């Protein structure tokens, strides 16, 4: 399958009859951008992406060596994909290699989405091109929906979480503004209200994050729960934690040679956003410009957008939803 020749623009009229029948029976709504969404297994999807989810659940053949990068949208997905790729492929692609794949491809190409690319473009895609030793995929599906497609596999799942307020603001910039001319599709206030209702792509946020949090507590060898804020604060400790989980620990020689810092620098948002492929390139699967995947990547940027009243409202929602879970941001 050629990433550069496949389009993700599946229209509603191209849905299978099975998908149409199911969708007609599901709760439906419109998100803040006016897009129709339907609720499946507690999560909101556009109809085409739901078809990708259904195809994945039905036809994916997992391998125990698979690695899946999971996240709610706009929680540091691009960063985590780059780090994971650099870690598990470092024997083949040293971080100092002038021809490292991260220098010529966007991380979303190197870790393709199961439901938004592979199984959206094909009911049963050919996955033979992926490395048999450790195939690398990604998803925005909640844990219980993903697990249905994994069929009991013990593959590794790495989940990146983020403070809800920074997630919301990043979500608004990505989905609700046309990046080329800053045309507002939906105001931050409208996006905020829909977010609080949970009616947003792959939402509700709190159900999504809790599904992986609980999964990491139940089976820590299967699910690693990471936090964007901790990655920013202590990148060396967190990347070593990630390497240990993935079974590719840094050797003493690698640490002494500075490899950990090399990978951190290679995968930094500063470096990735400066690359020509990410300044002028596009994802051929969607047509979206690569530069839209990089904004600030900061902690606390929400303070520039949310009022004290909005802050208080969403904090109260999160406090209620995460109550007694042990999860805090």
Swiss-Prot record:
Domain of life: Eukaryota
GO function terms (MF aspect): sulfotransferase activity
Active-site residue list: 140
Pfam annotation, one family: Sulfotransfer_1
Presence of keyword Transferase: yes
Gene Ontology CC terms: cytoplasm
Alphabetic keyword roster: Cytoplasm, Transferase
EC code: 2.8.2.-
Intracellular or extracellular location(s): Cytoplasm
Leading EC class: transferase
Cysteines paired by S-S bonds: none
Binding site for 3'-phosphoadenylyl sulfate: 74-79, 162, 170, 295-297
Family of this protein: Belongs to the sulfotransferase 1 family.
Stated role: Sulfotransferase that utilizes 3'-phospho-5'-adenylyl sulfate (PAPS) as sulfonate donor.
Protein name: Cytosolic sulfotransferase 6
Gene source species: Arabidopsis thaliana
Gene: SOT6
